[in-house]
Structure formats: structure tokens, C-alpha cells
A protein has these predicted regions:
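Bacterial N-terminal signal peptides
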Residues: 2-10
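Short acidic/polar inter-strand loop motif in beta-rich domains
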Residues: 120-131
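Extracellular beta-sheet/turn segments enriched in Thr/Pro/Gly and aliphatic residues
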Residues: 47-57, 133-159
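Bacterial Sec-dependent N-terminal signal peptides
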Residues: 9-42
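Short hydrophobic alpha-helix segments
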Residues: 95, 131-132
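Short amphipathic, basic-aromatic surface patches that mediate peripheral association
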Residues: 53, 58-75
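Tryptophan-paired
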Residues: 81, 86-114
Length: 159
């Protein structure tokens, strides 16, 4: 009898004060950003990758990555979206992606063993996401993924 009473009391305390409204989901809001003008270090200030060599940059190493977003984010891809690589706050590469394709190619410049974070700009929401998985460590003349088997990079929206 005591257990039954506790359950009834807990249900009664969860009800609203005579309010029969259905709770509504409120989408979280995040900081919106204007279109970032990320500059590729190999392109002399241009914001597109030109496939230049690492000799055109002040860095001794470069690597190539083929990247895709997780399935949950692919449905929202647009041709206005951007992807870039960073070491701290410094842009180390800007990705290219053929129109309406899901695979990004990015050449990343820096020094061997530097930790790299990818940033993804989702143009329709004006959100910037940071990569959280996998860990990306720059390796000289290295490669992560291929066009046919790209690395899936999981992202978290910047708040």
C-alpha cells in the first residue's frame, strides 16, 4: 500500500496546475556567424584551395584529407557550406568539394605532429561546427582517407 501511494503522489506532483497544454520542443539557439573568409595558406590569400605545394607556405609539412560529414548532417549540405583546417586560431587549409558532392578534399599545412581541428560552416543556419572525432595529427606528406573511403568527421556546434 505504501509503494502504491508513493507512485500516485509522484505522478500527481508532475501534473501542471490545471494546464492541459502539450509541452513543445524548443530548438536550441547558437551563435550565428557571417560567412567566414577562411584563407588557404597555399593560395596567397585566396579562400579556395589551388593544390599548391608546401613550398609556397611557411610550413615544412602538409597532408591531404578526404572528409565526409556524418549521415545526420549530410542532408543539410549546401554548395555555400565551407570546411577548413585550423591549428589554434590559424587557418591551415580550406577544403574543396565538387558541387552537390558529399566528399571534401583538404590539403592541410603546418608542422609534423601538430593537432588540427576542422571547422565546418553551415550556411543555411550560419553555424560553425568544430571537429571532435577523430583526432587529427598532421603528418608530413600524410593522407587520411581517400575519395572512395573518406574519413567521417563528427562535429559539435560552437556555442
Amino acid at each position: 500500500m505504501m509503494a502504491t501511494l508513493a507512485v500516485v503522489v509522484s505522478f500527481a506532483s508532475c501534473s501542471s496546475s490545471g494546464d492541459n497544454e502539450t509541452p513543445t520542443y524548443k530548438e536550441p539557439t547558437y551563435t550565428q556567424h557571417e560567412d567566414p573568409q577562411w584563407e588557404d595558406p597555399s593560395a596567397g590569400g585566396s579562400s579556395t584551395t589551388t593544390g599548391g605545394s608546401s613550398s609556397a607556405t611557411p610550413y615544412s609539412s602538409d597532408m591531404t584529407m578526404y572528409v565526409q560529414l556524418p549521415d545526420s548532417m549530410k542532408a543539410y549540405l549546401s554548395n555555400a557550406d565551407k570546411l577548413a583546417a585550423f591549428c589554434g586560431a590559424e587557418c591551415r587549409g580550406v577544403a574543396t568539394r565538387p558541387a552537390n558532392d558529399e566528399v571534401w578534399m583538404i590539403r592541410i599545412y603546418g608542422e609534423a605532429n601538430e593537432e588540427i581541428t576542422l571547422k565546418y560552416y553551415r550556411a543555411d543556419k550560419k553555424y560553425i561546427y568544430d571537429s571532435v572525432e577523430p583526432q587529427i595529427v598532421l603528418s608530413n606528406d600524410g593522407q587520411m582517407g581517400t575519395y572512395d573511403d573518406p574519413v567521417t568527421v563528427f562535429m559539435r556546434v560552437e556555442e
